[in-house]
């Protein structure tokens, strides 16, 4: 039977519960255990698919087409286990399911209440599908004390009593702020956070304390005394120089040993952390630097590009170089010459996005890369803008544009109205809902034999990648674009949807309709990112 680890947060938000959960999952996995990670999000949205990147950050898409929290990206990158739609749920989804059942009459006229109906639905979700796992780590979004989180805290409190003894523990992630004027770490915020947690019936077994310095023994003793935990269970989670150092740091602090002790388990083998050590050695001792310009729409909120940042880092790890990022708001290029901003970079990446704002700036970035032979990587929207640039400046279709921005005489990019998912036909219309209506999840693509992208994938002609888009490049323009050098080197298996474009006579210019960053791992860098960084190294004359 699976054992459950519930991870909560206190004092402030954005402490890194998702990263802490992922790192602990990696440590348990390194000890030979089978691990599953799940996320409970208290917000009322059905999913984050329609939420602003500035509020929520990245939407992480799974193979089965779920739009989920970015923490699931951490889970995948640290454990290598693909997440599914069954690993993330929101209050909105729970309420939708309950109200659907109520309308059907499933509750036989009962009064629907938070307790027991909402809490039971949460418990059913947490306990479902875990037979093959040794440990299930469940992260509760938000911080203790949030009104919207109360049903989730009540549900995990009940589970602590309902599961067999030694089958559930609670880890509370908290902050120990350092006050320079006092010259000491302050424990009072953590004491109050734990007091709040205990007031709703949850006694943490382990305190995971975020700090920028060593926790003095006296402060550990005080935390143990006033928070009612063993002193050994006060774990120092000190800041590290890169996120892939977290598993080793947590192991050195004794987190995994303390978790096993809380379950009454004698450690059977030490964790196999050699691969994590190798990654950190490469991160800390690079053989050179490359600079990549990210020309995006949401550069003020780096979390909007979380998987992208990590995938570029993985490309650097694969090539033993440090990847420096130069963030450029794409709107700047609508009024400024791109050259002063881009002449010093070794590669240009134009990521996904939605809407007209900043689109012309992305088109100009693609033009600069094409004309100056700078490696260019266009992802989703970035591929579409590269195609529009080619149509305007190579083919001479001056009015080339996307119907996403409004009516146009030359729709190089248009709304997808139907496509195949397996054997089922998906259909969409211009007037349809925004939420959950995109082409989402893993889809196959057929690569042109002998193309650059086929070589990048090791000679493969069939691949599967994750998508999140509503618009597509119009194949009616395919022949004219190819006559001017822009090759369609990847298509959907039925030949209807363009998946990849490239210039054969360019050092490295590839646009993809999918999101390869979602499948990159530190141990297995995505081949497109590894190849892109390698091309940037050539550009920088490192090789």
Swiss-Prot record:
Residue positions binding Mg(2+): 71, 139
Keywords: ATP-binding, Glutamine amidotransferase, Ligase, Magnesium, Metal-binding, Nucleotide-binding, Pyrimidine biosynthesis
Gene Ontology MF terms in the entry: ATP binding; CTP synthase activity; glutaminase activity; identical protein binding; metal ion binding
SUPFAM superfamilies the UniProt entry points to: Class I glutamine amidotransferase-like, P-loop containing nucleoside triphosphate hydrolases
Description of activity control: Allosterically activated by GTP, when glutamine is the substrate; GTP has no effect on the reaction when ammonia is the substrate. The allosteric effector GTP functions by stabilizing the protein conformation that binds the tetrahedral intermediate(s) formed during glutamine hydrolysis. Inhibited by the product CTP, via allosteric rather than competitive inhibition.
Cited function: Catalyzes the ATP-dependent amination of UTP to CTP with either L-glutamine or ammonia as the source of nitrogen. Regulates intracellular CTP levels through interactions with the four ribonucleotide triphosphates.
This protein's name: CTP synthase
Organism: Bradyrhizobium sp. (strain ORS 278)
Gene from which this protein is expressed: pyrG
